[in-house]
Amino acid sequence: LVESTATGIHSLTQSFSVASGLTYTASAYFKRGGQNAAIIELISTFGTNKWAIFDLQNGVVGTVGTAGIAEISSIGNGWYRCSVSAQATSTGTGYLNLYIARNSTDSSASYAGDGYSGIYIWGAQLEANSASASSYVATTGATASRGYDNAVMTGSNFSSWYNQEEGSTCVEFKMSQPPLTGYYN
C-alpha cells in the first residue's frame, strides 16, 4: 500500500456482514515499506475504539483503542502478523480498515504522504466467532471455513529423529477456550 501525496488517510477498506454479540478477529501480515507503522480497525457495527497501531520497526503493539485486543508476532525477515479482536455491538455492515501510520502513537492516521512510502500487506483475513487469529486460510473472495489446526505424530515418518525414550518437545499455543477447573476423571 503506497501513500498518495494528498493529506488524508492512506488505507484499504473491506465491508462485511456482522452479527451482534460475536467476536471478530481481523489480521494481516505487514512489513515496513518506508513507513514504520500500520493500523487495523474494525468499525461501524463495532462501536468505537476497536483499533490498534502496530510498530513495524520494533515489532511491538503501539497505541490500542479502549475496546480492542491487539497482538503482533514476528514471522521473520521484517514481516509481522498483526491482529485486532473485538465484539460486535450490533448487526449490520462492518468495515475492516488497514491504514498506513507514521508512528505507533499517532492514531489520527491522516497526514500528507510523499507518494512513494508505505507498507507491505499480505494475507488480510477476517474471522467470525474467533477471539484470536488462526492460521491463514487462502480464499478467492468467497467465505471459507476449515477445521481447527491439529498437530499429530503418527506412523513411522518421524522415527529417524524422534525417540520416545529421550528428548524434549516444545509447543507454543493459545487456548481457544477458557481452561477447565476442578477434578475430571
Language model region names:
Residues 1-185:
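Extracellular and organelle-lumenal recognition/adhesion modules and their flexible linkers in secreted
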